[in-house]
Amino acid sequence: MSGFFITATDTEVGKTVVAGALAGVFRELGYNIGVYKPLQSGHVASNPEGDAARLKVLSGVPTKEDEICPYSIEEPLAPRLAMKRAGRAVTLKDIIHHYNERLKEFNSLFVEGAGGLAVPYTEDALVIDFAKELQLPLIVVARPTLGTVNHTVLTIAYAKAHGLTVAGVILSGCKECEMERVQENKVMIEELSGVPVLGLLPFFEGEFTKKEVLESAKEYIMISKLEEFIRNESTVAHTSSN
């Protein structure tokens, strides 16, 4: 298996934009990359305002929204609670099954979780349990502002305590007027966690286009560093299969 698991320090931090943008950039580079977000609350998968639709647009994958996100519900709650209130039972086995189905189409998948790693996810698992099953390197998306050092370092420590590899951090929503503080936060996160901050993605105000997002990702995220992970994972997978 290869790809990345995109998680965050909180909800509404920018995971979907980062996941979609990275997938779109890698697809432009010629990689057969897909996107997968198994559970979504707040919108049904087909809603153009929802994460599944945004992932499809930004990544440029041919996959239908309800295949990108097989389980979605309108109520904006933690996925486990939202599904329970809707009378739907979704297990870890279910979402892994759909993950394997997507791998029949793509060589690698960029998987987006929900909120942070300790979010109640399926009826029998937290987000981190799903990440542990996949064993993909993590990309942690975080806010660039006050409080982010604590939230980010704790997220990384939690991931490492569960045996997961953290490829890097991306600070999302960076404003030019705050860049001095953002840079200070970047340095502190790297010093305290031992994990590199691979990008400072700008704040997108109002409506934005796919082109704007992908160009920003190319300019502000260390794509070459992430590409090394994809190549290394592919090499390991090829070696293991021989």
From Swiss-Prot:
Pathway(s) of this molecule: Cofactor biosynthesis; biotin biosynthesis; biotin from 7,8-diaminononanoate: step 1/2
Reported cofactor(s): Mg(2+)
Catalytic reaction annotation: (7R,8S)-7,8-diammoniononanoate + CO2 + ATP = (4R,5S)-dethiobiotin + ADP + phosphate + 3 H(+)
One Pfam entry name: AAA_26
An individual GO BP term: biotin biosynthetic process
Binding site for substrate: S41
Name used for this protein in its record: ATP-dependent dethiobiotin synthetase BioD
Keywords recorded for this protein, A-Z: ATP-binding, Biotin biosynthesis, Cytoplasm, Ligase, Magnesium, Metal-binding, Nucleotide-binding
Domain of life the protein comes from: Bacteria
Organism: Bacillus thuringiensis (strain Al Hakam)
